């Protein structure tokens, strides 16, 4: 037995150098083997990797190493999602150039990732801020422009008047800019958009074919695309109350069945009818101005107090010319959704009910639950949105909701006004075109030129890339590109006159919407992709990343792939065949009495205190309480809830510290073993120590097995005895179960089977004092299989063990061992036992046991004896391999 401990600090750098020198993870595009493309979402170069990165990239690495061992040509690349606001913030706060800050961070994080022992093809590495990358992004923008998939249009945006920039909805907090604190204004500005809505139905339909995606992600995308079938209804406006030039109000509704419950109309603050009414009523103008100060995020609008102002305009009910409905400007209606106008049926929509209760407009229920008396059915504070029959609806009374919708549709489609139907069936989508303009410096320049004579002129392909200037200043608010003295001033490529560059840059989601395709051939200087290569290597077979990207990144990537197909850059629609969303890494939080958060690294030892108390019944109850102290002062700390690791709560653990103390393999093993990969993993120092102990245990098993392996014959024995068969069954059973777990991405299950197998092998080693040749052979075979099973998870340790066992080459290049199916067959079978049809227990017998042996084993069961209670047995019915029934 070896007494020498495994030394991760010496071993891990050694094998990392060996892998790098031998270039064993470099992928050849012309490799004839079947391809397998595994990709984890590439990181933003913030400067440090965190434990979430360790978990994410370890999962991908296990898949990559396993598929490589199984004979696939594995593509497993890495790059950097490098444009974005943090680099500009660093420039402002630390007076460092965004480019320098970004590339310094990339260098630091790459070094950290390399210590993890990931099987990455670093030759394909790029950063999205490399001009050699965004040159091709600019080319695709121009291709999209030619194809009508990119356009410039006026859009309502959130404007920060202090920072002088457009804010995303998420950057508006309580109506103020997240950084400046200024009151946000809504403005209309020219913005570049990608026409993602062209693919709304296709993006929706294709979700059904993404059967290796999580259901929750597909549901989130379905809801975001938001297909709804309804009617477009033209409400006439009462001429006596309506501004000149306005005659009707179009609304889209999915609940045309509730038209007889209408109590008001509501329009967006920027609806043409609202703008027409404002000049004659200062209160309407003031209300519209107030609405403009609020963000445009749907979530903010949904939670804000519902407010409106009566315009004095009246709309005419489509089924009753005498029925006039008040038209309100409302803060909860957006011009971007539907037609920017709605009819309010408060009895059956909670938002509408809150509104009418505020303005005392009343409500009339028009759908009554089945079995309830319509005469007594009333609505007060809670709207009814369930199924039922129509009431208070004239010709619709008694119909179901679907029948009522159909009847309304037929009548409105045949009724006309001014030669056009009053209503028509329509499909509406919640999805809106993707606005990509950002008033930021650190992003991909949009390759167009604005000429006073020629209008918008694309930058010629020969002049790409349009490169960002490096001599920029962030002393003034707004976009540094706007303030640059020379960069934006150019000659129009069409007329030769004076012109200016577009100073908006692209949304950083554009950069990450096609990087996976670029990885297939990042050396192509002439085009974004090499068609025969990208069509061979795509789609990504297994994509791994956080569920927070379920909508925007994944949906934009799906659109972008379709747009690339339409412009000849790829030949497929879907970029990711398989999608997996891993859980977060979470940790306890600790706080001082002053409220200051404390890092786990600052803790003294943790103590668990038990106390025994007697409850009201006199029974003694034991309770446990953990206590922690601040190392520096001895102050007892408050143990807070377990939360996602974050800098703000200081509950982070530095991967460098863990890898430096325990080694990368220990960190990898812990991240995989503690919980199912789609759930959060709770960081535990004890759990890490347990993983470290298992590393040492495997090292001892490998060394002990190596001693016995010296006694093994070179050739496979003709026969194996019972002990050898047991070892081989354990090995091949584990081989089958571990691979099954990896294929299902149930890494924690695979690791549990590895532990079970390691224990079984250790037991066999403990008993193998003087092993027979067949047992020595079986132990050597089992040890080799154990090392190969561990290799995807703990590759450095596996290489050391592989060497100790006398195996040639690298385990990272070894083929996956083959399972012998005969060794998966169990020798025993467990049968349920009934007495007079009622289950009384189970009996385990040899699979080939004869009926007399089964009967004897059944009658020997204590539970059967108790059930018989001395009664004679009439007969025993045995259904082979299924069940036994004793009849008395």
From Swiss-Prot:
Motif ('HIGH' region): 43-53
Catalytic activity, as annotated: tRNA(Leu) + L-leucine + ATP = L-leucyl-tRNA(Leu) + AMP + diphosphate
One term under GO cellular component: cytosol
Chain positions of motif 'KMSKS' region: 644-648
EC numbers on record: 6.1.1.4
Recorded superkingdom: Bacteria
Protein name, entry field: Leucine--tRNA ligase
Provenance organism: Rhodopseudomonas palustris (strain BisA53)
Gene symbol of the encoding locus: leuS
